[in-house]
Amino acid sequence: MGELHRVCKNFTRHDKKTRTILLCEMLEYTNVFLEAAFRAEGYSFETLKNPVKDRTLALRYISNDYCYPTVLILAQFLEYLESGERDPEEITFMEPQAGGACRAGNIYNLLQRVLYRMAEQGQTEYAQIPVISLNLMGEEKHTGFRITPGLLSGGIAAGCYGDLIMCLYQQVKPYEQNPGETDRIRSQVEKKLCESIRRHRNGRHTREKNYRYACEVFSKVPVKPGK
């Protein structure tokens, strides 16, 4: 592992200006708000939206003893690399790290190892991709990434808004009278809440105001009689 850490690249202040941070898709309703939170702090940030087509990509580098979420997450990163959408020098991978004993909690380290093995097999450019650990424990520090109070408050707002939109959307969508109306409202609410995050208005008072706004707008979606 010592050799591995010498290969894995540090995410520098210069990288913050030139690289896009890519996070695997885990929380559909929260992703759009996370993107707003990171961008508000000056990061170029995206969540991967490519659906996993071939999970066996991950099994080239890890055994099938790993849990299914681990396989899917690694496969999504690997499929993105194979797509050639961006040059390896333009991207950074980010992975939440729980730091526990569960294998899923150590996907961060596993992703580093996979990139290292790919570099060993001749794809040396992949060794230059920084991998950022998203955690609150101060592990795996990078000189160009820091969880600031602004990023933390934006992340909290993102989590709260994501859960709220999920509940409202799933309660209304199956019973909408006009097909597509709930999706339109969801997009409208997400746009307003993202703007609030981008303006660093993440305090409790503002969040509660936004909760009421979202509930009010969704409540006006026409639903089928009796629902």
Spell out what each predicted region is.
Residues 1-227:
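An N-terminal assembly and electron-transfer interface module characteristic of large anaerobic redox
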